[in-house]
């Protein structure tokens, strides 16, 4: 009977390998979780007493106005979503014809661009970034624009941590005017706010910016994000979003987090995270089992290790959970490390030094 039911599923879904989220891979294993780019500290809010027997607003007006104030945009340029992930999905739903249109994504990057297109039956044009610099391959993108409706760019890029040249993003916007939308995923932009593209929304009707409260705002657990674009794009996305995407508790917490005092606390946490990242990068460069530490503009660092499998497994067994990137495009032997607290970072460095002393003898250096 089960086999008969499975036959009913779509062919592309049968073949689909779902996104391997941090909780799906790591579960509750470990006590130092450096695998999901979450804030290492939580903030707490008292919920207002409200009746929950009525449905919420589809787009809570106070939430929209609060975020509009934060990003200095008009309310009609903002759509609240269940994390930035829902924005990724809605854009494909609203703008791509299955079996006809295509998206471009540039690995190594966030996999949900590819996965959402696969689910929707939309062609994926994969144009890797330039190895080791991780910058956009503009020539190949330009040569592959036929039938493309969406170009997804994560900036800062996950998992490499780099910022894309602003002149390259503007070039993309210019060559796609009237043809495709350029979607800049700014999930990590609070860690490099000067690199945001929101100021260009007034100049480019084909620019879409995705944001989230999951990272710098330390609210991954409430799933609240935003899509920023021209009002015509927001109106189109509003046609395909579910009727009640933002629950009352989520809206209340998000509104509180956007108050002046909480925004300042967020900026303080970002400063701590950025300082910890600088410290961690300098420490990692002196570890024997580390081959390369890539510069980062976000709350994580990409590291290439000798004996990377053994490093990953050893730390896992010690309760330090990192994110293995070895299977990603051009990331052989790489592991991504999220920024934790300073004490968590000290523990990580301590264990890596112990590992190097124990394992990095001459005979094992050959894996490099």
Swiss-Prot record:
Annotated pathway: Amino-acid biosynthesis; L-histidine biosynthesis; L-histidine from 5-phospho-alpha-D-ribose 1-diphosphate: step 7/9
GO annotation, biological process: L-histidine biosynthetic process
Pfam families named among the record's database cross-references: Aminotran_1_2 (PF00155)
PROSITE patterns tied to this protein: AA_TRANSFER_CLASS_2
Residue positions where N6-(pyridoxal phosphate)lysine is found in the record: 215
Enzyme Commission designation: 2.6.1.9
InterPro entries: Aminotrans_II_pyridoxalP_BS, Aminotransferase_I/II_large, HisP_aminotrans, PyrdxlP-dep_Trfase, PyrdxlP-dep_Trfase_major, PyrdxlP-dep_Trfase_small
GO molecular-function terms, A-Z: histidinol-phosphate transaminase activity; pyridoxal phosphate binding
EC supergroup of this enzyme: transferase
Catalytic activity, reaction form: L-histidinol phosphate + 2-oxoglutarate = 3-(imidazol-4-yl)-2-oxopropyl phosphate + L-glutamate
Top-level taxon of origin: Bacteria
Cofactor list: pyridoxal 5'-phosphate
Keyword terms: Amino-acid biosynthesis, Aminotransferase, Histidine biosynthesis, Pyridoxal phosphate, Transferase
Subunit annotation: Homodimer.
NCBIfam families linked: hisC
Family statement: Belongs to the class-II pyridoxal-phosphate-dependent aminotransferase family. Histidinol-phosphate aminotransferase subfamily.
Protein's name according to its UniProt entry: Histidinol-phosphate aminotransferase
Native organism: Buchnera aphidicola subsp. Acyrthosiphon pisum (strain APS) (Acyrthosiphon pisum symbiotic bacterium)
């Amino acid at each position: 009977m089960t086999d008969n039911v499975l036959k009913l599923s779509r062919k592309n879904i049968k073949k689909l390998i779902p996104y391997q989220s941090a909780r799906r891979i790591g579960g509750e294993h470990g006590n130092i979780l450096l695998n999901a780019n979450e804030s290492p500290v939580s903030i707490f809010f008292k919920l207002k007493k409200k009746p929950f027997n009525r449905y919420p607003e589809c787009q809570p007006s106070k939430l929209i106005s609060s975020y509009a104030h934060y990003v200095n945009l008009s309310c009609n340029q903002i759509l609240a979503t269940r994390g930035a992930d829902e924005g990724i999905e809605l854009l494909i739903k609203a703008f791509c014809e299955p079996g006809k249109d295509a998206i471009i994504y540039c690995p190594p990057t966030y996999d949900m661009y590819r996965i959402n297109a696969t689910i929707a039956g939309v062609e994926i044009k994969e144009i890797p970034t330039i190895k080791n610099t991780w910058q956009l391959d503009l020539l190949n993108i330009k040569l592959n624009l036929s039938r493309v409706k969406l170009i997804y760019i994560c900036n800062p890029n996950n998992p490499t941590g780099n910022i894309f040249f602003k002149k390259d993003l503007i070039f993309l916007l210019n060559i796609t005017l009237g043809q495709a939308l350029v979607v800049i995923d700014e999930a990590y932009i609070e860690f490099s706010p000067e690199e945001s593209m929101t100021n260009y929304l007034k100049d480019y009707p084909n620019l879409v910016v995705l944001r989230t409260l999951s990272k710098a705002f330390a609210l991954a657990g409430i799933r609240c994000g935003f899509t920023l674009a021209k009002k015509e794009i927001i109106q189109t996305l509003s046609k395909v979003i579910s009727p009640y995407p933002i629950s009352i508790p989520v809206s209340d917490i998000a509104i509180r987090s956007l108050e002046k005092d909480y925004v300042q606390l967020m900026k303080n946490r970002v400063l701590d995270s950025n300082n910890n990242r600088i410290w961690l990068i300098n420490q990692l460069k002196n570890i024997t089992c580390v081959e390369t530490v890539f510069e980062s503009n976000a709350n994580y660092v990409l590291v290439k290790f000798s004996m990377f499998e053994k490093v990953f497994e050893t730390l896992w067994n010690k309760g330090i959970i990192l994110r293995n990137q070895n299977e990603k495009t051009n990331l052989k032997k790489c592991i991504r490390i999220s920024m934790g607290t300073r004490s968590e970072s000290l523990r990580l460095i301590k264990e890596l030094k112990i590992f190097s002393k124990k394992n990095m003898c001459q005979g094992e250096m050959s894996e490099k």
